[in-house]
C-alpha cells in the first residue's frame, strides 16, 4: 500500500551477498521536514515563554532601560547611586583582550539595568495581581460606578495596555480564596430553606452548627494550608474525584454536545464541510501553540484564566480500574476517522505544510468512497468507550496492550482529535419540532459506537454537511470548547468559503497517499466485552429523552426592559416552570465560572432561593397585584445576581464544602453534615451556554448565523438537565433532558412549562415582540 511506503524510512533484506538497505528518499524527506517543524515549535515555545515571563514588560523596555543607564553614565550622571561601580568591583578579574575597563563598565551597567527592569516587572505584576483581586466592580450598578472602581479600572488598563499573549496574565491572576466556614454554612442554610419544612430545616441547622463548631475548624486549617502552596485549592481535586474517579459511563453522564449553525447552510457536501472544519481547527491549534489567541477579558480588561485551553488538542482520557488518566501530547500530526464501522488515520501535514481544505476534502471523500467492510469486531469497538470504565480498562489491558491492536489504538489516542463521518442527515426545520431534538440525540450519544468518548472532543459530520461536537468533560468546561467552536464556524463561513458547487476552494494535491486503514485483530472474548459495553450504553441512550426547541417570542433585547439580567430572568422562569411541572421546589444547580482566579473552573449557583420561591408561590396563587409580582420578581432577580457574583468571586458554597469533605476523608473524620450535603441530588441541573467569546463577525449584520448551543444528559434519575443559549437579541434555544424510566419527568412537558413561564413573566412587564 502507498501509505505503508510513506511510513517507513528504509527497508532491508538479508541476501547471500549481505544486507541490502533500500532508502526511501520521500520518507526521509518527510522525517527531516517533521524534525524541522518540531524544532520550530520548540523555538516558538521558548520565545513565548520569555515574552510571557516578562509581561507586562518586553525586550524593548529592557533595551530602553539599558540605553537610559548607558546614556546617563555618558552624561556623567550616576542614576545607579554607585551600584554600577559596586557591580564592576564584584566582577571576576579581567582576562584576555576583552577584559578592558570599558567592557566591564558596560557589562556592569547592563547587569544593573536588567536588575532594575526585572524589579519593575515584579512590582508591576504584583500590583496587577493585587488589582485583579478587587471584585467590587461586580457588585456595582453600571450607572453607579464608585470612584474607587473608576481608579481601579484606569490602573488595570495601564498595567495591561500592552498586547497580551494567551498566557500573559496567568501569573498575575489571584488565587482562589478559601471562604470562612461560618459564611459558607450561613449561605448553605439559606439555600435549603425553601426546600425544607420547619422540622427538617431545624435538623439540618443542628447538624450544620455541630459541624461548624466541632469538625470544621480542623478541616479548614488543612484546606487553608493547601491553598497556600497549591495554585488552586479546588481544581485538582475536582478533576480527580468528580471526573477521573467516576466509574460511570462517560456517554450521557459526563460528555456534552455542541450544535452547528442551524439557520443557515454553507454546503451539502459532507467531505467539503469537514475539510474546512478540520483545517480551521488546526489553524486554531497553531494559534494556540503560538499563544496568538487573545485571552478572554471581562469588560474588555479583566483577564480570565486560560489554563484549560492547554489540553484542548492531542488529549485522551485513558481508562483505569480505579481512576482514569488524562494523556496529553505536545504534538499530533493526524486525526482518527470513523466511517461505516472502519477506522482510518488521516495525516494533517505534508512534510511541514498543513494540508489545505481541498486536500482534506479529497482525503475524507476517499474514505467515503472506500467500499471495504469492517474487520471482525471493528464496527462496535468504540462502544468500549461508552460503557463502564472498569470494563473498558480491563479490556484495554487484556486485548490492546501489544501488537497491531496497540498500534491502532495508539493511532486513535494520539490523534489531534477524533472525527466521525455519519451516514445520517440532520437539519433544523422550524416546522418540525422533533428535528432539533433528533439532531441533539445524535450528537449526545449517536448509535453508542460511532463516537470515541475518551477523546477531548469528537467532530461529528452528518451526511448533509451539518457538523457537531461531542466533548469529554474532565479536561475543560463548556466555554473553552465554545471558544474553539466559534472560531471554526466563523472561519468556515467568512474566511475559507466554498465554490459554487459546494466544494472547498482550490485544487487538491492528487499525489497525496490515501488515508491509512487501521488494522485490528479482535478475538472472540474481546468481541463479547464490546457487545456487553454496547448493551450497557444502548440502554443508557434509549432511556434519555431530549427535547430541544427555539423560543421565538423574544430574546435578550426585550428581557432588558425588565431591568434585570437575562440569566436571572431565565432562571426564575425555570423555577416557575419546575413548580408547575412537579408541584414543589427542588435543589437547583447552575454552573458559574471562577476563571478570574488562576486555574479556576466552576462554582455552583443554587438558583432556588427564598426570594424566587416567594415569587413562584405568588404567581401560582394568581391573586396578587401586578405591581406586587413585579416587586417580588425584582427581589428574586437581585438575589440571583448577587449569588452569581459571589460564586464568581470565590464566595460560593459547594466547592468549599466539597473540599472540606475531601479533607475529612483524608483525615478519616466522619461528618454527618458533609455526608448529607454531598449526597443531595440535583433534581434540576442548568447551564447557560456562552456565545460571542471571539469576534468573528457582526451578529447584527448576520442575525441568522447562530448556533443552537448544546446540551447534556440528566444529572439525577428523577431530574432534568437544562441548558439554554440566549442567542442574540430576539431568540433563545433550550435543551432539556430527562429519563424515560422516571415517572416524574417528561422533557417535552417541562419544555412547554418553560415556554409558558417565560411568556407569563414577560406579561408582568407587558413585554411583547412589538415593543422592540
Swiss-Prot record:
Location comes to: Mitochondrion outer membrane
Name the GO terms of the biological process aspect.
Answer: carnitine metabolic process; carnitine shuttle; fatty acid beta-oxidation; fatty acid metabolic process; long-chain fatty acid transport; response to blue light
Q: Keyword annotations for this protein?
A: Acyltransferase, Fatty acid metabolism, Lipid metabolism, Membrane, Mitochondrion, Mitochondrion outer membrane, Transferase, Transmembrane, Transmembrane helix, Transport
Instruction: State which residue ranges cross the membrane.
Output: 48-73, 103-122
Specify which residues bind CoA according to the UniProt entry for this protein: 555-567
Query: Which reaction does this enzyme catalyse, per its entry?
Result: (R)-carnitine + hexadecanoyl-CoA = O-hexadecanoyl-(R)-carnitine + CoA
* Function according to Swiss-Prot or TrEMBL: Catalyzes the transfer of the acyl group of long-chain fatty acid-CoA conjugates onto carnitine, an essential step for the mitochondrial uptake of long-chain fatty acids and their subsequent beta-oxidation in the mitochondrion.
Report what the protein is called.
Carnitine O-palmitoyltransferase 1, muscle isoform
State the organism of origin.
Answer: Mus musculus
Question: What does the organism's lineage look like at the top?
Answer: Eukaryota, Metazoa, Chordata, Craniata, Vertebrata
Amino acid at each position: 500500500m502507498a501509505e505503508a511506503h510513506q511510513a517507513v524510512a528504509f527497508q532491508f533484506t538479508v541476501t547471500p551477498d549481505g544486507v541490502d538497505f533500500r532508502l526511501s528518499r520521500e520518507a526521509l524527506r518527510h522525517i527531516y521536514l517533521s524534525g524541522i517543524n518540531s524544532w520550530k515549535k520548540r523555538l516558538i515555545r521558548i520565545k513565548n515563554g520569555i515574552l510571557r515571563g516578562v509581561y507586562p514588560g518586553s525586550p524593548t523596555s529592557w533595551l530602553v532601560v539599558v540605553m537610559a543607564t548607558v546614556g546617563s553614565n555618558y552624561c556623567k550622571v550616576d542614576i545607579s547611586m554607585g551600584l554600577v561601580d559596586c557591580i564592576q568591583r564584584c566582577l571576576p578579574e579581567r582576562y584576555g583582550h576583552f577584559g578592558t575597563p570599558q567592557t566591564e563598565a558596560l557589562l556592569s551597567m547592563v547587569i544593573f539595568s536588567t536588575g532594575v527592569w526585572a524589579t519593575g516587572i515584579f512590582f508591576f505584576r504584583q500590583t496587577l495581581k493585587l488589582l485583579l483581586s478587587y471584585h467590587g466592580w461586580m457588585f456595582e450598578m453600571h450607572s453607579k460606578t464608585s470612584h474607587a472602581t473608576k481608579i481601579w479600572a484606569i490602573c488595570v488598563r495601564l498595567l495591561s495596555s500592552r498586547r497580551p499573549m494567551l498566557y500573559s496574565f496567568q501569573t498575575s491572576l489571584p488565587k482562589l480564596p478559601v471562604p470562612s466556614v461560618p459564611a459558607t454554612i450561613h449561605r448553605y442554610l439559606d439555600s435549603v430553606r425553601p426546600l425544607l419544612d420547619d422540622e427538617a430545616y431545624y435538623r439540618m441547622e443542628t447538624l450544620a452548627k455541630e459541624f461548624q463548631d466541632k469538625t470544621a475548624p480542623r478541616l479548614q486549617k488543612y484546606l487553608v494550608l493547601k491553598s497556600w502552596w497549591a495554585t488552586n485549592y479546588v481544581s485538582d481535586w475536582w478533576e480527580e474525584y468528580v471526573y477521573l474517579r467516576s466509574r460511570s459511563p462517560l456517554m450521557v453522564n459526563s460528555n456534552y454536545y455542541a450544535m452547528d449553525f442551524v439557520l443557515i447552510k454553507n454546503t451539502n457536501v459532507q467531505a467539503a464541510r469537514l475539510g474546512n472544519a478540520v483545517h480551521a481547527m488546526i489553524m486554531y491549534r497553531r494559534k494556540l501553540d503560538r499563544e496568538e489567541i487573545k485571552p478572554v477579558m471581562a469588560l474588555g480588561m479583566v483577564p480570565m484564566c486560560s489554563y484549560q485551553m492547554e489540553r484542548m488538542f492531542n488529549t485522551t482520557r485513558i481508562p483505569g480500574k480505579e481512576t482514569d488518566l488524562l494523556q496529553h501530547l505536545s504534538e499530533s500530526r493526524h486525526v482518527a476517522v470513523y466511517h461505516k464501522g472502519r477506522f482510518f488515520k488521516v495525516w494533517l501535514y505534508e512534510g511541514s505544510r498543513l494540508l489545505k481544505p481541498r486536500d482534506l476534502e479529497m482525503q475524507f471523500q476517499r474514505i467515503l468512497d472506500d467500499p471495504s467492510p469492517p474487520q471482525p469486531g471493528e464496527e462496535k469497538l468504540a462502544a468500549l468507550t461508552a460503557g463502564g470504565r472498569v470494563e473498558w480498562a480491563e479490556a484495554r489491558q487484556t486485548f490492546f496492550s501489544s501488537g497491531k491492536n496497540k498500534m491502532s489504538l495508539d493511532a486513535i489516542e494520539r490523534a489531534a482529535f477524533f472525527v466521525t463521518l455519519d451516514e445520517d442527515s440532520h437539519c433544523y426545520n422550524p416546522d418540525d419540532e422533533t428535528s432539533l431534538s433528533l439532531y441533539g440525540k445524535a450528537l449526545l450519544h449517536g448509535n453508542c459506537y460511532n463516537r470515541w468518548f475518551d477523546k477531548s472532543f469528537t467532530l461529528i459530520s452528518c451526511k448533509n454537511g451539518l457538523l457537531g461536537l461531542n466533548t469529554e468533560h474532565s479536561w475543560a468546561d463548556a466555554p473553552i470548547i465554545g471558544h474553539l467552536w466559534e472560531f471554526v464556524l466563523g472561519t468556515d463561513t467568512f474566511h475559507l468559503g466554498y465554490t459554487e458547487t459546494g466544494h472547498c476552494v482550490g485544487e487538491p494535491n492528487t499525489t497525496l497517499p490515501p488515508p491509512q486503514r487501521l488494522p485490528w485483530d479482535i478475538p472472540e472474548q474481546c468481541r463479547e466485552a464490546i457487545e456487553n459495553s454496547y448493551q450497557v450504553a444502548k440502554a443508557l441512550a434509549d432511556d434519555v429523552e431530549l427535547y430541544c426547541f427555539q423560543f421565538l417570542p423574544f430574546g435578550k433585547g426585550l428581557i432588558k426592559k425588565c431591568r434585570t439580567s437575562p440569566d436571572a430572568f431565565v432562571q426564575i422562569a425555570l423555577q416557575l416552570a419546575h413548580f408547575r411541572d412537579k408541584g414543589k421546589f427542588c435543589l437547583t444547580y447552575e454552573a458559574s465560572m471562577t476563571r478570574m482566579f488562576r486555574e479556576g473552573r466552576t462554582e455552583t449557583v443554587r438558583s432556588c432561593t427564598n426570594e424566587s420561591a416567594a415569587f413562584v408561590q405568588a404567581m401560582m396563587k394568581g391573586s396578587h397585584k401586578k405591581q406586587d409580582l413585579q416587586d417580588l420578581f425584582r427581589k428574586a432577580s437581585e438575589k440571583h445576581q448577587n449569588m452569581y457574583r459571589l460564586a464568581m468571586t470565590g464566595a460560593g458554597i459547594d466547592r468549599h464544602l466539597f473540599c472540606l469533605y475531601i479533607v475529612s476523608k483524608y483525615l478519616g473524620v466522619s461528618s454527618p453534615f458533609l455526608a448529607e450535603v454531598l449526597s443531595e441530588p440535583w433534581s434540576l441541573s442548568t447551564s447557560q451556554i456562552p456565545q460571542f467569546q471571539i469576534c468573528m463577525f457582526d451578529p447584527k449584520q448576520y442575525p441568522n448565523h447562530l448556533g443552537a448551543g448544546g446540551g447534556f444528559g440528566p444529572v439525577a434519575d428523577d431530574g432534568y438537565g437544562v441548558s439554554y443559549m440566549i442567542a442574540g437579541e430576539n431568540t433563545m434555544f433550550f435543551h432539556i433532558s430527562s429519563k424515560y424510566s422516571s415517572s416524574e419527568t417528561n422533557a417535552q412537558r417541562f419544555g412547554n412549562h418553560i415556554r409558558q413561564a417565560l411568556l407569563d413573566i414577560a406579561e408582568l412587564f407587558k413585554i411583547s415582540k412589538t415593543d422592540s
